[in-house]
Amino acid sequence: GARAEVSADQVATVMWDYFSQLSSNAKEAVEHLQKSELTQQLNALFQDKLGEVNTYAGDLQKKLVPFATELHERLAKDSKKLKEEIRKELEEVRARLLPHANEVSQKIGENVRELQQRLEPYTDQLRTQVNTQTEQLRRQLTPYAQRMERVLRENADSLQTSLRPHADQLKAKIDQNVEELKGRLTPYADEFKVKIDQTVEELRRSLAPYAQDAQEKLNHQLEGLAFQMKKNAEELKARISASAEELRQRLAPLAEDMRGNLRGNTEGLQKSLAELGGHLDRHVEEFRLRVEPYGENFNKALVQQMEQLRQKLGPHAGDVEGHLSFLEKDLRDKVNSFFSTFKEKESQDNTLSLPEPEQQQEQQQEQEQQQEQQEEQQQQEQQQEQEQQQEQVQMLAPLES
């Protein structure tokens, strides 16, 4: 089966959340850093995601914790320095753009409008899908409640036998539909990421003529913007997924209660069944109302981030805490790199040392192949011998006559 894993993204999120909690601008991060606390949080993540630790996870955990602690300390120390670097970078970019302040502001404004136009169809589709999928979920589940009520009326004498399959089917249907729901809704976040890349690239091209020799520094600022915007897309995906799981957790006990009530009296079961349809409807509707605005809120957040960039690059920028997103990007890049290296090394090690049963199997296969080759070689040698003997017989035949 598929191996449960702790991802680079989950580890980076734990680290960044902890880093952010220490101080809003990480000034006092070094003083407050508690190695043991970060270690506990990472260990808790492994425990939560994997339950019992397998060899792979144990090895990863052993190597990851010292790496994470060291990276955390470095980030805390680099924070002040990076803040100063970003401030200088912004000053230089602003100085280059200042003579064209109105045009730059106008170009960013045009990009904001283009971004909204790009995202609008997807936001509408997401909203439509939320409504369609929740309606479908309701249509799929309601008949089970009605069917069970009918079975109750018709088979009062043999309730357990008659109703249990329906209760089991309801549980399976809930799981299946929630998975389908997630499968339909979460891909929108990836579509949004593609649109973000297009928008930022167009913005880079439209601002390039004004940046002159500060082009590289402007590109760096735009990388920071793209990172923040894509992070929003990831959060949207996580939020949809979490809401779908929450819906499953609210619906699943309804099926469990039905199965439990089969052992009780008919009156209690009748009451539960009468309420089942209403409960299903209510939970599905709550999910719809909660998730429906997600797309629109996501759009607003992206527009706000573009507006913040316009402010940062404008003549009246003020003091902006712009370095933290770069710090987070650096952290996530380093954690991703650590995971890639670890997985690469693990796959190399696996080819060298397979688990015992696999090793034995491989050895057995090798032995069988060697045996086959030996037998083949023997047959060839025998054949050659026979051919040589026949040749000798043919050569001697004229002499004998």
From Swiss-Prot:
GO terms for cellular component: chylomicron; extracellular vesicle; high-density lipoprotein particle; low-density lipoprotein particle; very-low-density lipoprotein particle. It comes from the Eukaryota. Phosphorylation sites are present in the extracellular medium. Residues 1-4 form the signal peptide. One of its GO terms (biological process) is phospholipid efflux. It is found in: Secreted. This is Apolipoprotein A-IV. The lineage of its organism: Eukaryota, Metazoa, Chordata, Craniata, Vertebrata.
